[in-house]
Amino acid sequence: MDKRTEQAFAYLEKNEHSMMELLKNLVSIETPSADREANERIAAHLDTYCDALGMERQIHHFEKAGPTFAAWTRPQEKKPILLLGHMDTVHAVGKFGPEPFLVKDDRVY
């Protein structure tokens, strides 16, 4: 294993708990595509999270659709990385049962 890979695995191991908490928080905010309020909640959650990291961010609101969210860091000497995703879970609230995020036998469901 090369040095960069070792560093990446060490970082992941060191930060596993906080990353799992973030994932749990995000997954637990059910956001059906047509539920504008739910999508506003997850955008606000991401905004608060990224603000705490010192990131620049912006929520874009639309008249006929839920928001989009963008966050970025100030330019640095290193090459930028783009992460792209979606905030809606598509399915209706409650479709995944009482626990939309579950850890069982060291696996996340």
Task: Please provide the spans of the model-predicted regions.
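Acidic/His- and Gly-rich active-site-bordering loop/insert found
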Residues: 2-109
